[in-house]
Amino acid sequence: MIPGEILTDDGEHELNAGRATRSLVVANTGDRPVQVGSHYHFFEVNDALSFDRAAARGFRLNIAAGTAVRFEPGQTRTVELVALAGERAVYGFQGKVMGPL
C-alpha cells in the first residue's frame, strides 16, 4: 500500500442507500451564483435560493462528498436531498437550528 492510497471494491457503490430522500425545486432569485456543498444543511443555505425551506430541514444534497451544486442567477432546478444521519443535531451554518432536529 502507498501512503494515502485508497483501495476500493470492484463495481459500483450506491451512495446513501436506505436513507430518506426528497426532491425540491430551487430557484436562485439573486444576482450572483450560489454554490452549495455536499454536507451543508440545505435548510440554511443562502436566502437568495427560493424553495420550501421547511421541507429541507434536516436534509442535505444527495451528492458525493466533497462536491457541490451551483445555482446561477435566475436558474431554477430540481435537487434531491437526503436526510442527515448520525446524531441528527445541527450546529453552525447560519445558526438557525443550533441543536437537535
UniProtKB/Swiss-Prot annotation:
Keywords: Cytoplasm, Hydrolase. GO terms for molecular function: urease activity. Its main location: cytoplasm. CDD domains: Urease_beta. The gene is ureB. This is Urease subunit beta. GO terms for biological process: urea catabolic process. It catalyses: urea + 2 H2O + H(+) = hydrogencarbonate + 2 NH4(+). GO terms for cellular component: urease complex. Belongs to the urease beta subunit family. NCBIfam families: PRK13203.1, urease_beta. Heterotrimer of UreA (gamma), UreB (beta) and UreC (alpha) subunits. Three heterotrimers associate to form the active enzyme. It is found in: Cytoplasm. Its EC number is 3.5.1.5. Pathway: Nitrogen metabolism; urea degradation; CO(2) and NH(3) from urea (urease route): step 1/1.
